[in-house]
Amino acid sequence: MGRPAPRPLLLALLSLAVCRGRVVRVPAGTLVRVVGTELVIPCNVSDYDGPSEQNFDWSFSSSGSSFVELASTWEVGFPAQQYRERLQRGDILLRRTANDAVELHIKNVQPSDQGHYKCSTPSTDATVQGNYEDTMQVKVLADALVVGPSSRPPPGLSLREGEPFELRCIASTTSPLHTHLALRWELHRGPVHRSILALSHEGRFHPGPGYEQRYHSGDVRLDTVGSDAYRLSVARALSADQGSYRCVVSEWITEQGSWQEIQEKAVEVATVVIQPTALQLAVPRTVSVTEGKDLDLSCNITTDRVDDVRPEVTWYFKKTPDTSLLASHMLARLDRDSLVHSSPHVALSHVDTRSYHLLVRDVSKENSGYYLCLVALWAPGHNRSWHKVAEAMSAPSGVSVTWLEPEYQVYLNASKVPGFSDDPTELQCRVIDTKRVDAGVRLTVSWYYRMNRRNDDVVASELLAVMDGDWTLRYGERSKQRAQDGEFIFSKEHTDTFSFRIQRTTEEDRGSYYCVVSAWTRQRNSSWVKSKDVFSKPVNIFWASEDSVLVVKARQPKPFFAAGNTFEMTCKVSSKNIKSPRYSVLITAEKPVGDLSSPNETKYIISLDQDSVVKLENWTDASRVDGVVLEKVQEDEFRYRMYQTQVSDAGLYRCMVTAWSPIGGSLWREAATSLSNPIEIDFQTSGPIFNASVHSDTLSVTRGDLIKLFCIVTVDGAVLDPDDMAFDVSWFAVHSFGLDKAPILLSSLDRKGVVTTGQRDWKSTVSLERVSVLEFLLQVHSSEDQDFGNYYCSVTPWVRSPTGSWQREAEIHSRPIFITVKMDVLNAFKYPLLIGVGLSTVIGLLSCLIGYCSSHWCCKKEVRETRRERRRLMSMEMD
């Protein structure tokens, strides 16, 4: 059984191939036109072969049975005789719109043009297939549309802006067919026409561009009056409404469910002229006002409108006299609701119906310029809307602000003049004979200093302080630090008085001083601008400077005394050219000339300051803490006492006196310092003379050995019982080859047997002991390299006096002895040698072991012996 063929698909392809061919089309349905209008019938061809540009033939038949040639695009003699005249006049013509499309135009259609129109195309195809013609029916109706204005000729309306107006258009039709009318109002102004409002054939309203808002607000309306009148109503006329108004009416008919316009007529209804609203403004031409006063400008309005219009008034300010608003500043605005919008210090008021006043308070020079008044008139519209009916700008009003500067004089005097250094100085700068200094003017001061010169050289003034208009005080470089420290005080005592006070006047402050009083004027933004400066005459601050003189005389009231007695010394002070002096006293002591124990050494013992506060300075004798007293006998006399004097107290004693001068409050300034004549304490005695020396059996030791040093005290002169002698012994070392370093305390032993050891940074230790009455042994155990150097001892002898008190003698020092610490070479190299030999032996044995193992196991090869063949020699005689 065979496979069936796909018959449906094959039949479809076959029918598509057969049906495909040329297609000629004209609009489907019936085309309706009115007598006198233009008829346009389009025709196009598709799916054809041959050239791209196709030709068309048009034929007409009134009944649809026999067609008469009407027009052709390619054959001149194609039209019938009755149509050739209309073709020549252009009433009938063909207009090609594309290579495959053409339009038939028949102007001024007549009833005889009603019938059937056929469009055909000559064949250019290889095979004839498809349709080559298409036909449509045209109906021609009589003109039954009547359009006209409500009155003839068209009226001319003259209106004012804001007034209402109405226009009417009559339109009707008596067509036997069911037709609809569409109406459109247009405004023509020269070559430009605008659509205002239209009523479509479907009964819908369409406002034109720019009229949407007015239509929705009800300002522009379109309604019918009766059966044939259409009324355009404008509630408020605008200047843009001026022009010629036309009523355009079109008639529509429905054919096979679609609407088509069959004719359109237009008629001139009216010409509307909008008269502009007269608006004039009057402002003063020029105004002069004093700075600080109020500026009052009026803007008077004149208009021919008597209806309900509301003005909007705006004032502008600018620096140039033109009327352009460029680079202008708006000052105030009164809107149509009578709400005022203004900048600070500006007010806008409504005086009467047609007068508006601008008030600028507290004017300044910045207000000089030109003022413009801009007025706009607003008329109410439909549905609470407003529209502008007029606007005008006034001529510029020139305003000049004059300044009447304040008048005053400045007088400077010195209320306090210094007689000495550190005395206060006070200057007062007063403002007198003031005129025109009101609340809008502030007076501030600046202080200046100028150094006096003996010659005629000009010296620049130095600013001390300046006060700005906001009362801010700024210091100059000369006075900044001293003002911050409170030495310079600038103040305003009264409204007209400024003061400058120097708490402590120095010689550098001598010179000329003057003040400058500045007038500041307040601006509208609450800022202050300087307007005037007035200088005072200078005041010279000077006093004759003489050197301060301070003389101190010391005396010893009691005669010569012995050790253990009380020493007393008084110091009398006298001064000149020092203001209200107070004295501080320092007692000093120096060793007498020839004392080698501590030459040129000055020791401070006790002091008393200018407030009578006593202080022990370098008095270190703990056993005699209360042994010295310094007291004030009179304002210029002081007494020093030292109880239980020692032989070691011998020396030259002086009073060092410093004079202090008050500089204000509790502060004092050092005025002068002087040293009194010396008072000597010299104990004439035949007592023993002590000497000290250092001895060592070994001056060179090996590191680690014991260093033994003896401090030996010898006594010359009087023989003393050992129980009447005691010694303070201290050992010092200078660890250098010379004595160029500071000595280091090793150990000390006081007369009571208490040992004190100094701090050291290495391991060796020291010990100090008394070997005999006059010998003291210092031992350095386990000496180090750092222990080399110069060693010496310091001895302070103590001797018991016949009264039983101990007297300290002068401290004595031994000559230094140099100790050398050597290094033990054998001990130093013993351990490194043993370690080196041991390491070498171990490394050698290890190398031998490695070599043996390598040769025995790793590098051994089997050697084969080569055998040689031994053959016996045969006798040559053998056969």
From Swiss-Prot:
Topology with respect to the bilayer: Single-pass type I membrane protein
Name of the protein described by the UniProt record: Prostaglandin F2 receptor negative regulator
SUPFAM superfamilies membership: Immunoglobulin (SSF48726)
Organism of provenance: Rattus norvegicus
Leader peptide range in chain numbering: 1-21
Membrane-spanning parts: 833-853
Record-linked Gene3D superfamilies: Immunoglobulins
Tissue: Reproductive tissues, lung and heart.
